[in-house]
Amino acid sequence: MNSKDEQFELYKKEQLKKLADRIKELRIKKGYTSYEYFAYDHNIPRAQYGRYEKGEDLKFSSLLKVLQGLDISLKEFFEEGF
């Protein structure tokens, strides 16, 4: 792997961690102490949602579904926490 690839992988990992932290922060603000209850209430597979909060890559459509459950727009999500 060349230097640019390594830099990108590091950047991607950092950004996914920020995304995960933001999702978790908003879930807790909504009153969900457990990610499992949030996932269940919003019809998102629990294991899959758990991976999102751990910083694994997710599809854009999956992010939109999570944001719908959090009752926040894409714009608000990125303005306030990024």
Residue ranges and their predicted role:
Residues M1-K30:
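A short, Lys/Arg-rich alpha-helix, primarily the initiator
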Residues D21, Y32-S34, L58-S61:
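Residue-level signal for the short linker/turn that defines the boundary of a DNA-recognition helix
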Residues R27, A39, L67:
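The alpha-helix within a helix-turn-helix
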Residues G31-R51:
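Short alpha-helical DNA-recognition segment
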Residues P45-Q48, K59, S73:
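Short coil turns linking two alpha-helices in DNA-binding domains
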Residues E53, L70, G81:
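DNA major-groove recognition helix of helix-turn-helix
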Residues S61-E76:
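DNA major-groove recognition helix of helix-turn-helix/homeodomain DNA-binding modules
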